[in-house]
Amino acid sequence: MEKGVQERVPHAKPPFTLSQIKKVVPPHCFHRSLLRSFSYLLSDLAFVSLFFYLAIAYFPLLPHPFPYIAWPLYWIFQGCSLTGVWVIAHECGHHAFSDYQLIDDIVGLFFHSALLVPYFSWKYSHRRHHSNTGSLERDEVFVPKPKSQIPWYLKYFNNPPGRLISLIGTLTLGWPLYLAFNMSGRPYDRFACHYDPYSPIFTKREWIQVYISDAGILGMAFMLYRIGVEKGSFWVMRIYGIPLVIVNGFLVLITYLQHTHPALPHYESSEWDWLRGALATVDRDYGVLNRVFHNITDTHVVHHLFSTMPHYHAKEATEAVKPVLGEYYRLDRTPVLKAIWREAKECVYVEPDEDADSDKGVVWYRKKL
């Protein structure tokens, strides 16, 4: 149900099980259609191709000052379309694209590499995020810190100008910094990097796939280099680089807002269990972009419950599970820009309630430093 946006989600063990939730979902929602999945991918690629063609064929013909209007529009529209492609590749990593794991991995590897994402590397770390959502010790990304671990300099950014600088930096650089340096990721006992097969993120049996992911990135980087030699680096940045920055920004924005909310609990190991962690997420409303992003934005709760479910069934499944989840389900329709500003202000660190002796393993966001 839709509650007051800052009214806390229940943190006690739910009075239902995952199997009880699954029983109310229509069985066809779990069916993965290779043809239907490819139809969404091809639709995204058609829009990407259209915007690319318009940019290279017609933008050079525009009289001054229309290029200054056309190029930003291209970057926005192309960035949104490529985010849709990114989501489909993410779905491949969940084995939600088709019934064939090999096809899923080939499609996911190709299109994530095209967007400079190490497919298998992120697939494995993201799988652990799904296995440990809401856990302070084991979740993989956007893990909130207790007040005692807040960096000393954060107090200088806990104001409107500081928050703006922090948000701009996070949206533009957060994704590549996470992949390369594990920024905002789970702390490890040594350096962690998605490009390093021997990183503590990965097990020994995953090393080969990490090498394959790196090869995909190197192949794409070499292709961009060759295009840059032929067309110039400025051409590459205008056509590909800036839309990619927008894709990365949307990825961080979407993920941050799915898991950061004043009403959501996080759990220490003494209290955490998988179902409560999976329910410690929130659906958001991005308007028309919900469809452009294949509803990864407004069906995230059901995605955490059933990650192999294809996106085109997630809306129906969400409506089906709402009566069972009751107050454990949260949809926040706050406009996205307002929401990210509120969350940056309200969700600074986590602490347990002072008067909750029996719930010391449950922590909530706080803002007062």
Curated annotation (Swiss-Prot):
It comes from Trichosanthes kirilowii. This is Delta(12)-oleate desaturase. Its main location: membrane. The chain crosses the membrane at residues 41-61, 69-89, 102-122, 164-184, 207-227, 234-254. The keyword Oxidoreductase applies. The lineage of its organism: Eukaryota, Viridiplantae, Streptophyta, Embryophyta, Tracheophyta. A motif (Histidine box-2) lies at residues 126-130. GO terms for molecular function: oxidoreductase activity, acting on paired donors, with oxidation of a pair of donors resulting in the reduction of molecular oxygen to two molecules of water. Pfam families: DUF3474, FA_desaturase. It comes from the Eukaryota. The histidine box domains may contain the active site and/or be involved in metal ion binding. Its EC number is 1.14.19.-.
